[in-house]
Amino acid sequence: LEEIRALGREVDDPKVPMIFNKQSTSACGPFDEIHDPKVSNKLDYEGELAFIIGKKCRHVPREEAKNVILGYCVSNDVSVRDWQMRVPTFTIGKSFDTHCPFGPSIVTSDEISDPHNLDIKTEVNGEVRQDSNTKNLIFDCFQLVEHLSTSFTLEPGDLILTGTPGGVGIADNNFLKKGDNVKISISELG
């Protein structure tokens, strides 16, 4: 909720997740350079837990959701904030090329003790900006699978990001600058 409030939006306890797509060209490796958007100086980071769907599925109840998740990885939901806020949906501001680094590895579901109790930390140039735990997610991974699979078929390889803790740059106008080093770590994942 902290991140949503930092965007200047009033929220109560959300009843359904806010969902948006990212273009496939936003995906890149964890050590690839994040391209400067050139049309904005409001480039922001969002350290997030991501998970990968392992089985084609539809209408998956929460209790069975863990059975369709192949594994988990670290991700950065890079956002161009002014473009994100121009329209009601976030897709355009979150889909610039290279704005979804993830990896470097996928840790299979059976190797994770509890995906909803992992420490997550984001550092920019060595300064800790986000420090939280996935137990603070508004919607957990299994709720997201249930919600999304109610609307459409999930395919093997689909990458789903779970949301970010407080501490994003927009909260205090501390945006990324060219050459900044962003490091995101999640316990049990790297």
Model-derived features: positions:
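Generic beta-strand/beta-sheet core signal
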Residues: 125, 162-163, 187
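A conserved acidic, glycine/proline-rich C-terminal tail/linker
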Residues: 140-176
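Conserved S/T- and glycine-rich ATP-binding loop of Class I adenylate-forming
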Residues: 51, 157, 186
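Charged, cofactor-coupling segments
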Residues: 101, 166-190
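Active-site microenvironments in enzyme catalytic cores
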Residues: 1-128, 132, 181
